[in-house]
């Protein structure tokens, strides 16, 4: 990132600990606020990611930073026979487990508590790894991506959905107003944790999006790296493949 952004500026805790605390605090309101703040467009972005995933032969899939499980549930529309949803926040994960059970996917989806930078899986375990709005919360971005690379099978795919910043007028100017001023104020009216959405907005701005993130993926070892901007560049879907050697 351009600079280290943490949820609680005055805290001496690690970013990882702060992120866990933040998501535990907002877990009960996360889905509702996410729909309002994104104007529901995040649903369309996830559908696009799933369409990309469906082009691959997938037996085992891992959804990192699964949160309340939206993307893990959506992955049932791929060929995956085994889906693991992993999150560092017990509060978010508890809601995700409820969602999985309510939809009857408990035999397909396993929800586990875990750290994306220290994955408890063997090398070359998953055909597909997905991360939606999670990589910018990694304490060490390259370490987390290297762990993902390790657990993906050769020829396996990484798909990352993350916020980005539009570069063209007038979308860049509107995004600056929306993310920097309007979104935090909307969240403060509705959220118990006022600083959480300040952090989410600021971390989006400072995330190395576009070609900068492509370069990091290539550095880690991924090939056929590409990014696909969504909705005028407000978000991007990144893809990369693990080579056979």
Q: Which residues does each PLM region occupy?
A:
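N-terminal auxiliary segments of SAM/dcSAM-dependent transferases
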Residues: 1-20
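C-terminal alpha-helical "lid/dimerization" subdomain adjacent to the S-adenosyl-L-methionine
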Residues: 17-18, 88, 161-216, 220, ...
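Conserved alpha-helix/loop element of class I SAM-dependent methyltransferases that forms part
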Residues: 29-32, 38-59, 74
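Hydrophobic beta-strand segment of the Class I
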Residues: 30, 129-130
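Class I SAM-dependent methyltransferase SAM/SAH-binding core
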Residues: 60-118
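A short acidic, Gly/Pro-enriched loop at the edge of an enzyme's catalytic core
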Residues: 117-128
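A short glycine-rich, Lys/Arg-flanked "PGG" loop and its adjoining helix->strand segment in the class I
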Residues: 142-157
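Core SAM-dependent methyltransferase catalytic element
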Residues: 220-245
């Amino acid at each position: 990132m351009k600079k280290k952004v943490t949820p609680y500026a005055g805290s001496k805790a690690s970013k990882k600990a702060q992120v866990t605390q933040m998501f535990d605090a907002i877990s009960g309101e996360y889905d509702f606020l996410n729909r309002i703040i994104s104007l529901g467009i995040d649903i369309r972005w996830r559908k696009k990611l799933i369409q990309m995933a469906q082009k691959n032969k997938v037996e085992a899939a891992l959804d990192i930073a699964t949160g309340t499980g939206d993307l893990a549930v959506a992955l049932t529309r791929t060929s995956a026979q085994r889906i693991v949803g992993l999150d560092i926040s017990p509060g978010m994960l508890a809601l995700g487990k409820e969602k999985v059970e309510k939809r009857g996917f408990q035999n397909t989806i396993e929800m586990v508590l875990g750290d994306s930078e220290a994955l408890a899986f063997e090398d070359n375990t998953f055909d597909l790894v997905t991360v939606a709005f999670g990589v910018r919360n990694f304490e060490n971005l390259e370490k987390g991506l290297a762990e993902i690379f390790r657990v993906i099978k050769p020829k396996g795919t990484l798909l990352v959905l993350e916020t980005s910043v539009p570069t063209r007028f007038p979308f860049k100017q509107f995004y600056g107003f929306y993310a920097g001023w309007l979104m935090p104020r909307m969240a403060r009216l509705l959220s118990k944790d006022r600083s959480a959405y300040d952090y989410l907005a600021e971390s989006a701005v400072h995330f190395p999006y576009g070609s900068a993130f492509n370069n990091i993926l290539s550095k880690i070892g991924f090939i056929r790296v590409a990014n696909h901007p969504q909705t005028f560049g407000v978000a991007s879907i990144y893809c990369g493949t693990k080579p056979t050697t």
